[in-house]
Every structure is written in C-alpha cells, then in structure tokens.
Amino acid sequence: MIRRLAALSALSGLATAWLPEVNKKITSTNGTNLFSSSNGKIRGVNLGSQFVFEPWIAEKAWSDMGCGGQKSEFDCVSSLGQAKANGAFASHWGSWITQDDLAEMVSYGLNTIRVPVGYWMREDLVYSDSEHFPQGGLQYLENLCGWASDAGLYIIIDLHGAPGAQTPQNPFTGQYAPTAGFYQDYQFERALKFLEWMTTNIHQNDKFRNVGMLEVVNEPVQDAGKVGSMRSTYYPNAFKRIRAAEQSLNIDRNNYLHIQMMDRLWGSGDPNESLTDTYYAAYDDHRYLKWAGVAVSKDSYISTSCSDQLNSNTPTIVGEWSLSVPDSVQWNSDWAPDSNKDFYKKWFAAQVTAYEKQQGWIFWTWKAQLGDYRWSYQDAVAAGVIPTDLNSLAGLKVCG
C-alpha cells in the first residue's frame, strides 16, 4: 500500500501484512517500482465492466455482444443461451481491458487496479438449474493479473457480485434481483467457498503475485439493521476461511492477503463488530457526492471534498469515486463537462487531497462509453482534466 505505513502509529499493527514496500517490493519486468515516489499512496482505477458488466457504462459494447435490452449478465446469458453467451463474453474479456490499457495506466502515474469479479467465476458454485452466468472468465483474469504484475501494478480483487445478490435491482451484482438474497447462511457459504478458492489461486499462481488484497463483498445494503448477519457471521468466517486457506499452503504471514470490507461510513454497520482479530484488515469507502445530499454548488463540492475525513476505520482506501454530479444538473451550462473543465480539474484535486489523507484512492472507472469523462479516467486525461503527473495537483493548492 504505502512505504511509510509501518511508521504510522495508528496502523502499526499492519506492519507485517502484505503491502507494497512494507514487506514485499513490487517491480515491473523492467525494474520500475511504482510505489517508490515520495507520495507512495494508492492511486488507482477500477476495471468496471470487465468481469461484471454494468450495461449503463458501455451500452454499445453490451449491444455488440447481443445483450442489448438485457439488464444484467444473468439476463443476457439467459437470453443468448450458455454457449453463445460464453463466446460473446470471451470476446469482451479479451478486448475491454488490454495490456495496452495497463501500460497507459502506468504512464499516467497510477499504481493500482481494483478488479471487480463475481462469485460465478468459480463455476461449480453456480446452480446450473436456476442461475445463468458466463463461463470461462478465470483464464482472462489470470492473463489480466499477469500483465498487471508484469507492469508493476498492485492488484485488489473485489467480490463485486455475491451469491443471491447483496443489493437488489443493481447489475453490479451480476443479476437484477428483486430482493437482496445474500444475507442467509447458505449464500454466505457459497461466498466463503469462493474466497477460499480465490485465495488459493492467488497464492499458487505466479500471475497473481501482485494481488495483495481481497475484498469480501462490495457495497452491501446500506442499512445496518438488515445486515447484522453479515457482520456477525460472514465477516468473521471470511477471515477464518481465508487464513485457513493460507495456512494450509504454509504461506508466510508477511505474505498474507489483506482482507477488505466496506467501512462504517458506508452505512452497513461497523465491520469490526464481531471480529476478534483485525490485524490484516483493510477497509473500503465509496464517496460519490452525486448521491450524498451535498448542496449543489461548485463551492460546496470543493469545500466538502477538501474537508472530508474518511477515517472511521483504518486503513481505508476510497475504492470508488467519480467526478459525476446529480442527474438534475449534470448537463446544465454550469456543470456540463466540456464548458466547466476548470472546475472539474479543481474538484479532482480536492478529492485526491482528501483521499490521500487516508491510504489513497481508486477512481470509478478506467473507461466507459458514455461520452462523459466524469465517469472515465482515461477520457478525463484525454480531456486535460486529470494530469498525467499526479504530484502536480499539490501545486493547484485547491484546499489551501
């Protein structure tokens, strides 16, 4: 994560965990160390729609796959049939995020990728009589992580789509489920089996050598009273099962994975509530002012971001954020992306300033087909809104 982590007293218990520059160096095949700068923070992008397709991000690609009009991967596979869907998704996996994309990320000063995946990547967990997901994704995940490791990128793998869906009516779960069916023991068990399997793959396959963090579920329901079983049962068992898998492989404790959960600020309760040991824990916060009820003015957005203190649990990475603003104003003249680049440059800098008070940030997302750089890091760089020298942001002095 950061080279100075061991020096931070609040995080001293994490000093022997598997983090870049603490106990293990990350270098590219040509010897480049992306964590060797004086900053050393996580600076990354999400690979949205690579292995868990969200149609709103890339409608053209979705339509080209034959999935147009379908709400989720589950729906598309149901519509196309398994064999045809497998071919369509394989073509997508091989072209959406490429080795050239990863090289471009590195050239922009990024050092981390977060890779959303679904539990169905472990295919024997899928109920063949009632669940419909694409098959064959593991090979493409291996290739991607191998390229990223060669490039010197740190990798977080995130269980983005949980069994039964951790939130209703949202394609980021891989299905458009009417209710959140995840919060019951048999679904937890399927997720735990996925985590064990993923942990074993990470430690036994050299292509996964730069994977240092495994997130146990993305964006659970934001109602602590409804997800008590997740905190009391799933989180403790995730720790136990991941550690048991590592111990069975005789993994040195310095090479253990960080186990990541959404932090308390997310709204699903305190993730540490039932944990007896948080020695290797990490936390994720998602900060979208678009939906945060902040007064809709440019000054308010800048001041809110500059004053953000996202430290309810430590170490926290702000694992999703963007430059998008409320739907009601996003195309108004005062907020339109093409005519307000100066504001978006400053707001980007303000958010980076806040999130680097913690362990760093991961923008949502790397690429999109929206014609709107506020959701696409790649497009924002091309538009001149995000600099290729991220250290130059300090010179803007947006937050004083």
From Swiss-Prot:
Biological processes annotated in GO: cell wall organization; glucan catabolic process
Enzyme Commission code: 3.2.1.75
Active-site residues, record numbering mapped to chain: 219 (proton donor), 320 (nucleophile)
Keyword entries, A-Z: Carbohydrate metabolism, Cell wall biogenesis/degradation, Glycoprotein, Glycosidase, Hydrolase, Polysaccharide degradation, Secreted, Signal
Known glycosylation sites: 30, 272
Gene Ontology CC terms, in alphabetical order: cell surface; extracellular region
Signal peptide limits: 1-17
Reaction(s) catalysed (UniProt annotation): Random hydrolysis of (1->6)-linkages in (1->6)-beta-D-glucans
Superkingdom of origin: Eukaryota
Compartmental location: Secreted
Classification via InterPro entries: Glyco_hydro_5, Glycoside_hydrolase_SF, Glycosyl_hydrolase_5
MF terms (GO), sorted A to Z: glucan endo-1,6-beta-glucosidase activity; glucan exo-1,3-beta-glucosidase activity
Enzyme class: hydrolase
Function description: Beta-glucanases participate in the metabolism of beta-glucan, the main structural component of the cell wall. Acts on lutean, pustulan and 1,6-oligo-beta-D-glucosides.
Family, per entry: Belongs to the glycosyl hydrolase 5 (cellulase A) family.
Protein name per its UniProtKB record: Probable glucan endo-1,6-beta-glucosidase B
Organism: Neosartorya fischeri (strain ATCC 1020 / DSM 3700 / CBS 544.65 / FGSC A1164 / JCM 1740 / NRRL 181 / WB 181) (Aspergillus fischerianus)
